[in-house]
């Protein structure tokens, strides 16, 4: 049980690391169920949870101020969502995936959910504008030359 709790605590963050394994068909079914079972609000909370813990890193800590109370509340909401997905909405898919593909399926399935949640975030107009602002600083000529040289 401790192993399951530890895995569940880190699984969403898995999308930021290189994938060590691909999910099989049962893991795919589990991931699809998890995405279907979450609302846009749930996925926004997942991104908030990820952000709250990334913001603890010394290299980015000065960019965001998240109170301990907010972090505790996000932990509770993420734990509630995790339990709901694993033991209620996607219980059958979770059982089968773990039985056939092992505990690693938790990492890959929650990684899919995390990626979908982040994609939702990037669909926001303000985020798109911020990315557009970034691209103004790129040297398009050099990029075109690089692409042409790669052909």
Language-model-detected regions and their locations in the chain:
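N-terminal secretory signal peptides
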Residues: 23-75
């Amino acid at each position: 049980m401790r192993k399951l709790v530890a895995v569940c605590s880190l699984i969403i963050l898995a999308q930021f690391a290189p994938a060590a394994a691909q999910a099989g068909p049962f893991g795919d079914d589990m991931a699809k169920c998890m995405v279907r079972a979450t609302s846009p609000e749930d996925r926004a909370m997942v991104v908030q949870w990820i952000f709250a813990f990334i913001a603890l890193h010394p290299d980015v800590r000065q960019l965001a101020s998240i109170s301990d109370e907010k972090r505790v509340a996000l932990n509770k909401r993420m734990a509630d969502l995790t339990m709901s997905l694993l033991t209620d909405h996607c219980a059958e898919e979770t059982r089968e995936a773990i039985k056939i593909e092992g505990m690693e399926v938790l990492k890959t399935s929650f990684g899919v959910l995390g990626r979908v949640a982040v994609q939702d975030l990037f669909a926001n107009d303000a985020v798109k504008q911020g990315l557009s602002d970034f691209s103004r600083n790129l040297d398009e000529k050099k990029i075109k030359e690089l692409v042409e040289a790669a052909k």
